[in-house]
Amino acid sequence: MPELARALEGVPVLGPVIRIADLRTYGFRWGDTALSGELPVLEDASPTPAAGGTAGSGAEAMNEAADEYIAQVRETFLWYAAREYQGYVASDTGYQVLRDDDAILSLCFYTTLNAGGSVDYSRYFTLDKATGELLALSDLFLEGSDYVGAVSADILRQMEEQVAAGEGDYFIPGGIWSEEECFRAIDPDQQFYLDENGGLVIVFGEYEVAPGSMGMPRFVIDEEAISDIRAR
């Protein structure tokens, strides 16, 4: 489907970012197949390096990460569209501002793909405005600390409490799930964001730690579980 691929070359991607300045929408339709989305127009509002930071480093990193996400959306969309999956494919991308203050910008880019069924996926970005640094999960903790173990233990505790209260269903030991399916630990680079209260929120994809009925589970980590190893 070369015409479809050529048309998608005009879909806008995100430029250097520090602050959301405007909104930009895009759309494309090919018969019963449609790609649409709304992206933030972002600008680097701090061209002068902050103390200990480098000018534009966070903006450039955010730009590259966002470009990779949009490329993934396009690639997945084209894969289904080229196969005329049940005659209809639709991909819709949007974003959510999770936190935007003087210290932190946290964004979520999300996509819903409909192709005989609905699949949701997303990616999270957290930018330290003071340093211009795009944060990884490990950046939040003291070097050499077992943050994976501490965070994983608190998530497992929350999962067990929700299951016991009939408020959730997760792949945890002691239930109907096999050992291979059960949650043991987060990835060192697990998706996360920092909420408006400074809390660490860990996010999982669909079916990663729970049945599809649970969507994309989020867990706010108890500060007491990580206070002795948290660096920022």
Residue ranges and their predicted role:
Residues M1-R232:
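Compositionally biased intrinsically disordered regions enriched in Thr/Gly
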